[in-house]
């Protein structure tokens, strides 16, 4: 199975797999059962921003999800990613719908990682920024139902021609270049990621959510991972 570390924006409470009974943000280490969660007032039809940071000195992965009205949720978890992830990874965004549905629209996405080496005193950095997504976005690997170009956005899950979200859909977008996320001789390894999103649903219960994830470089969508598995995990263990 793939090795996945993710920050989930989970719109639907699947209490049978340990979710709290409300929409939440969570940190997932190799399992959809979050290590840590925080209550999130998801605003249907409003653009929100997610900001994720990590550095190897504090060994803490943190995320803040906020809306223009100042409403925000924060979650953090202490983890040494050297012990969890391979040295080279890919970063991506994933989303799913199930019985209930929502649009999982990404309007922008940026990422920066830095690796400061002891031996050479050099800093290796990787940076990308998408302020919009074109039809033929060559530097993204699209998986499942993900498409780009509609209004300059990235649609992670299926949307009908009139803009209505579809159920039982899963899609992911990964940056094409592998990221050197850690190195044994590095003094500091750090990264931060930001994306803006729009979740819109005609249902009283939108589902299922969006995640920023880091994985082994050959990661693909596990079969049967629509709905509560967010396109990331093969099962709910």
From Swiss-Prot:
Highest taxon above the source species: Eukaryota
Binding site for Mn(2+): 8, 10, 19, 24
Function, in words: Glucose/D-mannose specific lectin.
UniProt keyword Calcium, yes or no: yes
GO MF term set: D-mannose binding; metal ion binding
Record organism: Canavalia cathartica
Gene3D superfamilies: 2.60.120.200
Pfam families linked to this entry: Lectin_legB
Subunit field text: Homotetramer.
PTM section of the record: Concanavalin A-like lectins of the Diocleinae subtribe undergo proteolytic processing referred to as circular permutation. The propeptide is split into an N-terminal and a C-terminal part, the gamma and beta chain, respectively. These are then religated in beta-gamma order to form the mature alpha chain. The beta and gamma chains can often be detected in cell extracts. Residues 1-118 of the mature chain, as displayed here, probably constitute the beta chain in the propeptide, residues 119-237 the gamma chain.
Binding residue positions for a carbohydrate: 14, 98-100, 208, 228
Record family assignment: Belongs to the leguminous lectin family.
Keywords assigned by UniProt, alphabetized: Calcium, Lectin, Manganese, Mannose-binding, Metal-binding
Name the record gives this protein: Concanavalin-A
SUPFAM superfamilies the record matches: Concanavalin A-like lectins/glucanases
Further remarks about this protein from its record: Binds one manganese (or another transition metal) ion and one calcium ion. The metal ions are essential for the saccharide-binding and cell-agglutinating activities.
Binding site for Ca(2+): 10, 12, 14, 19
């Amino acid at each position: 199975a793939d090795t996945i570390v993710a920050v989930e924006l989970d719109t639907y409470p699947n209490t049978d797999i340990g979710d709290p009974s409300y929409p939440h943000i969570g940190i997932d280490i190799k399992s959809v059962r979050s290590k840590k969660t925080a209550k999130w007032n998801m605003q249907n039809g409003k653009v929100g921003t997610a900001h994720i940071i990590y550095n190897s000195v504090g060994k803490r992965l943190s995320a803040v999800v906020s809306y223009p009205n100042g409403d925000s949720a924060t979650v953090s978890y202490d983890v040494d990613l050297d012990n969890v992830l391979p040295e080279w990874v890919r970063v991506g965004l994933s989303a799913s719908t199930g019985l209930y549905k929502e649009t999982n629209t990404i309007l922008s996405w940026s990422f920066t990682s830095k690796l400061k080496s002891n031996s050479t005193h050099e800093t290796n950095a990787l940076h990308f920024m998408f302020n919009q997504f074109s039809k033929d976005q060559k530097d993204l690997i699209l998986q499942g139902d993900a498409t780009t170009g509609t209004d300059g956005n990235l649609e992670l899950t299926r949307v009908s021609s009139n803009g209505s979200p579809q159920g039982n859909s899963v899609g992911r977008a990964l940056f094409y270049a592998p990221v050197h996320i850690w190195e044994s001789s590095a003094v500091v390894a750090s990264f931060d990621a930001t994306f803006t999103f729009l979740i819109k649903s005609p249902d009283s219960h939108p589902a299922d959510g969006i995640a920023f994830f880091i994985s082994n470089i050959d990661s693909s969508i596990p079969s049967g991972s629509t709905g509560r598995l967010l396109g990331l995990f093969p099962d709910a263990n």
